[in-house]
Amino acid sequence: HAAPGESLQEQIGLLWERGHRQEAVDLLREALNQDPASSELKTTLAEKLLQLDQGDEARSLLHSLPEAERNRQPASGLLARLQFADLAQGAPDLAALEIQVQENPADCAARRQLAARQVLAGDDEAALEQFMAILRRDPQFGDEAGRKGLIALFEMLGNENPLTITYRRRLFSLLH
């Protein structure tokens, strides 16, 4: 268990790294029961739940935050990530989608699902590439899914992220 003086976040980080994910989540829930107003705890718990594919609970935690908190990092990024979890819901797995897109490059629906799966797998750059490809092939597809996907990813990554800077520039030159 915890060494004295170890912060809660450190304990959770260690449990998580060692694969004791449910214990980490339980510890966070316990802490949140002690301090139900803590935005930091809610955000951390939501992040962990998202990684465990428990999007519904993550969503309600994030929506329980004050609006000002919801609209800035890290909560805004997690909410953006939830959009990708929703897109990936019921989609084929990553490998199947990669094959689908390879066999039919014009399949924007498969590309969008692939991008969502890539985001959830932590491959943000590959996802950005898929959204750029959708935008180039069919800018109006799925109510501008290409552009909206890029913007949601920028939101998730934050303005300072080198990927955001690079792809925002590419988006701008594609649109203008």
What name fits each language-model region?
Residues D35-P36, E69-R70, P105-A106, P139-F141:
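Short coil turns that delineate tetratricopeptide repeat
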Residues G13, L62-N104:
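Alpha-helical adaptor scaffolds
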Residues E6-Q34, T44, A96-A121:
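Alpha-helical segment of the N-proximal tetratricopeptide repeat
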